[in-house]
């Protein structure tokens, strides 16, 4: 059995797939360690998940159209590669697995300079900047989509989007979250860091459509709004008079998805995969600044499958309320739940672990 290093970090969309694959590899008898930015979100998640963590420096690189990179960021990236090389020389892993994002780059580049096999996972339909820098020397790339723009021929293997394949009984999830068993539970989640646009608009819109007592046409509603840690102090006072509205800076995602009947989210690949695994219908507000507008295209594919509705950010205040009320109706919600389960990424972590094992040294 081998030690396998998961190079990841930055956002939950990069970190949680690494956690899911780590769990699968551990179940097969391997060892797994997360390698990412020292002090980053990935360090906290590793501790919460009971996974070993190795921290290094990491620097953000400028994407096309963003101008020249900050020299300080380049220096941090170079330091990170040196620190990762030192760790990998001592640890002697069987492979380093890169999940994208700037925090994964030091580990992947360090491995490639040391001749350690690297395997990547690309979650979008267009290869990201970090992955473009590493794909040429990677042994293989597991993908969430059948076709990935920018990926060298012969490198891609379709595996799907790894998610934490864990569910809680609804009553247990509600109890963990401090929510009631009975009302329709609406989850608001703008990604691991929160969403400024959703945090600004959603509380007012939900107050307007559900009223001070929190009632939809078919019955009571309760809201769990994961604002992101930095936005909680701004959102909480605005809903303090609404007993049915619970803002939190951060929430246990497995419990939140297990409790949710409906969710308002962005449209990152990881979020959509987790919603599908849990069978949660979505009202999606794609991030307009996403690379190549990939979140919009992600969201449209979910809508076309019958598992959600798309509300573009520029139409948020005019269209979100109607979309939520439509999706909250029992008949619509049941049909969407069935459609969501048909998109479930069950088995993706196992398929990607198979790919990693084929390239261990």
UniProtKB/Swiss-Prot annotation:
InterPro entries assigned to the protein according to its UniProt record, in alphabetical order: GlcNAc_MurG, Glyco_trans_28_C, GlycoTrans_28_N
GO CC aspect terms: plasma membrane
Entry keyword annotation includes Magnesium: no
GO molecular function: UDP-N-acetyl-D-glucosamine:N-acetylmuramoyl-L-alanyl-D-glutamyl-meso-2,6-diaminopimelyl-D-alanyl-D-alanine-diphosphoundecaprenol 4-beta-N-acetylglucosaminlytransferase activity; undecaprenyldiphospho-muramoylpentapeptide beta-N-acetylglucosaminyltransferase activity
Enzyme Commission number, as recorded: 2.4.1.227
Protein's cellular compartments: Cell membrane
Gene Ontology terms describing biological process: carbohydrate metabolic process; cell division; cell wall organization; lipid glycosylation; peptidoglycan biosynthetic process; regulation of cell shape
Role played: Cell wall formation. Catalyzes the transfer of a GlcNAc subunit on undecaprenyl-pyrophosphoryl-MurNAc-pentapeptide (lipid intermediate I) to form undecaprenyl-pyrophosphoryl-MurNAc-(pentapeptide)GlcNAc (lipid intermediate II).
PANTHER family per record: GLYCOSYLTRANSFERASE, UDP-N-ACETYLGLUCOSAMINE--N-ACETYLMURAMYL-(PENTAPEPTIDE) PYROPHOSPHORYL-UNDECAPRENOL N-ACETYLGLUCOSAMINE TRANSFERASE 1
Protein name per its UniProtKB record: UDP-N-acetylglucosamine--N-acetylmuramyl-(pentapeptide) pyrophosphoryl-undecaprenol N-acetylglucosamine transferase
Organism: Deinococcus geothermalis (strain DSM 11300 / CIP 105573 / AG-3a)
Underlying gene: murG
């Amino acid at each position: 059995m081998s030690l396998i290093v998961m190079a990841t970090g930055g956002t939950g969309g990069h970190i949680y797939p690494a956690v899911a694959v780590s769990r699968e590899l551990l179940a097969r008898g391997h060892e797994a360690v997360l390698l990412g930015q020292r002090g980053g979100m990935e360090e906290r998640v590793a501790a919460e998940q009971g996974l070993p963590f190795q921290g290094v420096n990491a620097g953000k690189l400028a994407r096309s159209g963003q101008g020249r990179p900050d020299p300080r960021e380049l220096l941090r990236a170079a330091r990170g590669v040196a620190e990762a090389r030192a760790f990998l020389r001592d640890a002697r892993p069987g492979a380093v697995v890169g999940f994208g994002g700037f925090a994964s780059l030091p580990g992947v580049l360090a491995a490639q300079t040391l001749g350690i096999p690297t395997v990547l996972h690309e979650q979008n339909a267009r290869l990201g900047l970090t992955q473009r820098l590493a794909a040429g020397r990677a042994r293989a790339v597991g993908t969430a989509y059948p076709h990935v723009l920018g990926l060298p021929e012969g490198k891609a293997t379709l595996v799907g989007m790894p998610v934490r394949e864990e569910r809680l009984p609804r009553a247990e999830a509600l109890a963990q979250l401090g929510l009631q068993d009975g009302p329709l539970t609406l989850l608001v989640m703008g990604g691991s860091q929160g969403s400024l646009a959703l945090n600004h608009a959603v509380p007012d819109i939900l107050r307007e459509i559900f009223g001070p007592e929190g009632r939809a046409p078919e019955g009571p509603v309760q809201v769990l709004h994961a604002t992101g840690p930095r936005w909680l102090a701004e959102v909480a006072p605005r809903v303090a008079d609404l007993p049915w509205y619970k803002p939190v800076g951060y929430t246990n995602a497995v419990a939140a998805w297990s409790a949710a009947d409906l969710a308002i989210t962005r449209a990152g690949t990881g979020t959509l995969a987790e919603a599908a695994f849990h069978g949660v219908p979505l009202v999606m507000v794609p991030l307009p600044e996403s690379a190549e507008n990939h979140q919009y295209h992600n969201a449209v594919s979910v809508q076309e499958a019958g598992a959600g509705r798309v509300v573009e950010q520029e139409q948020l205040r005019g269209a979100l309320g109607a979309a939520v009320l439509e999706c909250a109706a029992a008949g619509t919600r049941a049909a969407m739940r069935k459609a969501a389960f048909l998109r479930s990424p069950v088995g993706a972590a196992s398929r990607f672990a198979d790919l990693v094992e084929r390239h261990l040294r």
